[in-house]
Amino acid sequence: KATLTWFEEIFEEYDFVRDESDTGQAIQTSTGNYNHVAIYLDGMIYHASGQAGVVCQEPADFFESNHLYDLYVYPEMDIQSVKEKACKHLGAPYNASFYPNGAGFYCSQYMAEILPIFETIPMKFGDGEQEISDFWREYYRELGLPVPLNQPGTNPSQLAASPLLECKERNLHDSDF
């Protein structure tokens, strides 16, 4: 079993694998293996969620039995500095538009803000067949906004691929924590 003893230096990514929202599946289809990212600092999970915006949660309230989790570490992380930045943004809304200058933060945007080691990349919204999938066309139609295709942004899979991170554990279940 994995322990929480080295979590203060853990940069955590998680992969949905099973039961997940349509948005989560669309993110994974467009960008890679992951659909969400969070960070564990001093016993708490910090992340930006579509339901609550930027929050700090107890691990028991965060981990879900129908998800698999991969753990990453950034060995050079200044925990105190990252925690100060993480706390500064608590209560910010979720950036549902994924626009670079949208109000609030989406999950990987929040991570890149509090741990500024990641570059932005052109955002993708395709599904392997179309440059913009039907899901994202409808999503942005409902928002009344154009799809921000190729706008600068981040995504969880891109963050996980950073050469600055080390993968510590893969395919962990909620019961492993």
Tell me the role of every PLM-derived stretch.
Residues 74-77, 154:
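Short coil/turn linker and secondary-structure boundary residues
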Residues 97-177:
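Activation targets extended, charge/polar-rich intrinsically disordered C-terminal tails
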Residues 6, 81-85, 131, 135:
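Exposed alpha-helical structural elements
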Residues 87, 91, 116-119:
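Sec-exported extracytoplasmic/periplasmic mature domains
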Residues 1-73, 94-105, 120:
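Glycine-rich catalytic cores of cysteine/serine-nucleophile enzymes that process amide/ester linkages
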Residues 78, 82-86, 103, 107-110:
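Stable alpha-helical elements in mature extracytoplasmic
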